[in-house]
From Swiss-Prot:
Transmembrane segments: none annotated. Belongs to the dUTPase family. This enzyme is involved in nucleotide metabolism: it produces dUMP, the immediate precursor of thymidine nucleotides and it decreases the intracellular concentration of dUTP so that uracil cannot be incorporated into DNA. The lineage of its organism: Bacteria, Pseudomonadati, Pseudomonadota, Betaproteobacteria, Neisseriales. It is an enzyme of class 3 (hydrolase). Substrate binds at residues 69-71, 82, 86-88, 96. Pathway: Pyrimidine metabolism; dUMP biosynthesis; dUMP from dCTP (dUTP route): step 2/2. This is Deoxyuridine 5'-triphosphate nucleotidohydrolase. Keywords: Hydrolase, Magnesium, Metal-binding, Nucleotide metabolism. One of its GO terms (biological process) is dUTP catabolic process.
Length: 150
């Protein structure tokens, strides 16, 4: 499935590094830090990184999800400050990435470094129907850990 997404380059330095799929099977597109200079994230610190780009999905049956890059998280403890970013179809502002250094070492974010990935996902908008009781299920109200460890 392919959709067309409108993209604005808000900072001309990003014109040559717009998001592209790295391989035919890639699900995510890398977003880069649109910075004038390096930013050092101290342990436990968060920083809102501009990307210099804006997108407009327009179609409410799609959204964009921002996710951490696996290498940054695993090797350096750098994840998203909000864990997952959600870009609604009607948002038209600059894409910004909240980076969080959850490691015990400072981490330097360099200008134009790949900092997150963006995945376009289908959305279902639910209509809720109020009921007094649910039809029974085998799980019922069993929650946290109720299905066992393995």
């Amino acid at each position: 499935m392919n959709i067309e997404v409108e993209m604005k380059v808000l900072d001309e330095r990003m014109a040559d590094v717009v998001p592209v799929y790295a391989t035919k099977g890639s699900a995510g597109l890398d977003l880069r830090a649109c910075l004038d200079e390096e930013v050092v994230l101290q342990p436990g610190e968060t920083f809102l990184v501009p990307t210099g780009l804006a997108i407009y999905l327009a179609d409410p049956s799609y959204a964009a999800v921002l996710l951490p890059r696996s290498g940054l998280g695993h090797k350096h403890g750098i994840v998203l400050g909000n864990l997952v970013g959600l870009i609604d179809s009607d948002y038209q502002g600059e894409l910004k990435v909240s980076l969080w250094n959850r490691s015990s070492e400072p981490f330097t974010v360099k200008p134009f470094e790949r900092i997150a990935q963006m995945v376009i996902v289908p959305i279902v908008q639910a209509r809720f129907k109020r009921v007094e009781e649910f039809v029974g299920s085998s799980r019922g109200e069993g929650g946290f850990g109720s299905t066992g460890l393995h």
